[in-house]
Amino acid sequence: AEKEDLLRTVYLQEPVIDYEATVQVDGKVKEHRYACSGIDGLTFGPAFGDPKGKKQYLYVAYGVYGDTTRSDNDHQVILKYDIDKWGKYESHLLQGKLHRSGPKKAMSKYFVKTGNSTYGIQNLAYDAYTGNFYAAVYRGKKSIFPNYDLFVIDGSKKATKGIITTDNKAEKVEMLQLANGGRKDANTGITGWVFPWGSTGLCPVGGG
């Protein structure tokens, strides 16, 4: 890819900042804000709340460490980017000299309460038939959560205001909603599916 000039790359700064951060969690010093391990699943889709919208955005999900000793890793984190003018950021990939050309911040940063998972959303896929976003994970290990393998994020609903706790303080964030369907945990209200194969790949092909 370096010699053949087959692709261009864009640097995403926001996940790096969260990955490199050191925070206070339950009175202990922990590395990585929101337990960010980098980025993993990604997809293109319309804005949340506008499933019929023609404009497509890039959605990038964080990898999230499954550390069961911290309480700030029970949400999935998804960044939204408008890539219409990303041509100005595009640069050659040089693995020995990585560039820093890219947007300083995401257009939006969303949180989804799924409970603990192991390394966050492995595969994220927008399904045009339902208008929803499918998120496959490796199961979490906290017994207080149902630990599903697959979650469906409701694409018809706009993000709402919410509060999470990070670095020993409350933070106002944008929250996305899980779609109805599948199993619903009586204690947490979290909905999802037992579908371990989603972590190996997801590809909506239409028609439901």
Model-predicted regions and their roles:
Residues A1-Y11, S71-G96, F145-A170:
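Beta-propeller blade signature
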Residues L6, L12-I17, H99, S117-Y119, ...:
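Short coil/turn segments at the loop-to-beta-strand junctions that recur within blades
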Residues Q24-Y59, G63-G66, S117-G131, W193-G207:
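Structural signature of eukaryotic scaffold interfaces centered on beta-propeller domains
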